[in-house]
C-alpha cells in the first residue's frame, strides 16, 4: 500500500461527470486527498481535458436524457487517451432508463472499474431490483462482486457493511468503515471519485491498488466518525473532508482491516 504519497506528489487531474447533488462535496474531498478535480461535462472540450487527465469518473446519480451523449463521448475520449474510467451506476436497479444506459456504456466502451452498492451491482447482473439509491442489506457484497466480475470481466467494487473488491477473479474484503457514511448524501459518490484518484493512469489497476483506495477512504470515514461530534451527520461530512486531508500512508497499513478470500 504505497500509492497515497505518489498521488499527492503527482496531483492527478480527475474528470468527474457526477451527480449534481454531490459535486461540491466530491471536489472538496478530492482536493483534500491530494487530487485535482475538474467537474467538466461539455463534450466540445472533453477531448482536450481527457488528453491531460489521470482518470474519468462517470456517476449517473442525476442523469437525464441529454446527459447520455456527453457521458458516452467522454468515455470514448477516455478510451482514446488510455484514461481509466470508473463507473458509478447509481440507482441503476430503480429504472430501466438507468440500467439500459449503464449496460450500453459497458458494452460500447472499456470501463476499468464498476463501483456500486450490492443492490446496484445485482441489478446490473439481473439478480435484483431496488428502490431509490439504498442498498439491500441482505445481499452479500462478496457474492455480488463475483457475479458482476464474471459478467463484465472488469474490476468490481461492491460496497456495504463489508466492501468487496474483485479483480482477476480474486476477492479482497475491506472491513473498515462506519454507518455514518449512509447518513450523508454523497458518501458513496465521493468514494467512486477517490478510487478514480488512486487508479490514475492505470487502465487495469491491481487488486492491491484498489484495496488501498478503499482502505484509505473507509479509515478516513472511521476517523471522522470518532472526531468531534462525528456522530452528527453535518459534523461527520466536514470531518470526513478533514480526515482525507490528514490521513498518511503509514496510517493505512496500521489501521486497515483487509483479508483475501
From Swiss-Prot:
It holds the Pfam family HK. Substrate binds at residues 39, 186. ATP binds at residues 115, 159. Signal peptide: none annotated. GO terms for biological process: thiamine biosynthetic process; thiamine diphosphate biosynthetic process. InterPro entries: Hyethyz_kinase, Ribokinase-like. Its EC number is 2.7.1.50. Pathway: Cofactor biosynthesis; thiamine diphosphate biosynthesis; 4-methyl-5-(2-phosphoethyl)-thiazole from 5-(2-hydroxyethyl)-4-methylthiazole: step 1/1. GO terms for molecular function: ATP binding; hydroxyethylthiazole kinase activity; magnesium ion binding. The keyword Magnesium applies. It catalyses: 5-(2-hydroxyethyl)-4-methylthiazole + ATP = 4-methyl-5-(2-phosphooxyethyl)-thiazole + ADP + H(+). Its cofactor is Mg(2+). SUPFAM superfamilies: Ribokinase-like. Keywords: ATP-binding, Kinase, Magnesium, Metal-binding, Nucleotide-binding, Thiamine biosynthesis, Transferase. Catalyzes the phosphorylation of the hydroxyl group of 4-methyl-5-beta-hydroxyethylthiazole (THZ). Belongs to the Thz kinase family. This is Hydroxyethylthiazole kinase. The lineage of its organism: Bacteria, Bacillati, Bacillota, Bacilli, Bacillales.
Amino acid at each position: 500500500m504505497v500509492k497515497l504519497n505518489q498521488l499527492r506528489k503527482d496531483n492527478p487531474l480527475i474528470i468527474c461527470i457526477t451527480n449534481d447533488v454531490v459535486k461540491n462535496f466530491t471536489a472538496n474531498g478530492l482536493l483534500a486527498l491530494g487530487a485535482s478535480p475538474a467537474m467538466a461535462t461539455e463534450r466540445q472540450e472533453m477531448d482536450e481535458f481527457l488528453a491531460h487527465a489521470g482518470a474519468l469518473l462517470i456517476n449517473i446519480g442525476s442523469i437525464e436524457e441529454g446527459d447520455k451523449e456527453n457521458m458516452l463521448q467522454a468515455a470514448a475520449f477516455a478510451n482514446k487517451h488510455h484514461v481509466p474510467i470508473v463507473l458509478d451506476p447509481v440507482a441503476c436497479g430503480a429504472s430501466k432508463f438507468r440500467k439500459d444506459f449503464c449496460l450500453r456504456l459497458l458494452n460500447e466502451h472499456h470501463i476499468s472499474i464498476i463501483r456500486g452498492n450490492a443492490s446496484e451491482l445485482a441489478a446490473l447482473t439481473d439478480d435484483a431490483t431496488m428502490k431509490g439509491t439504498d442498498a439491500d442489506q441482505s445481499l452479500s457484497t462478496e457474492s455480488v462482486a463475483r457475479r458482476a466480475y464474471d459478467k463484465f470481466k472488469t474490476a468490481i467494487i461492491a460496497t456495504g457493511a463489508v466492501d468487496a473488491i474483485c479483480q482477476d477473479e480474486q476477492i479482497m474484503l475491506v472491513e473498515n468503515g462506519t454507518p455514518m457514511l449512509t447518513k450523508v448524501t454523497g458518501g458513496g459518490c465521493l468514494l467512486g471519485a477517490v478510487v478514480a484518484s488512486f487508479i490514475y493512469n492505470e487502465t487495469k489497476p491491481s487488486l492491491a491498488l484498489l484495496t488501498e483506495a478503499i482502505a484509505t477512504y473507509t479509515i478516513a470515514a472511521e476517523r471522522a466518525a470518532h472526531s468531534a461530534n462525528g456522530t452528527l451527520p453535518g459534523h461527520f461530512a466536514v470531518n470526513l473532508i478533514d480526515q482525507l486531508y490528514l490521513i498518511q500512508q503509514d496510517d493505512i497499513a496500521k489501521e486497515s482491516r483487509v483479508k483475501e478470500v
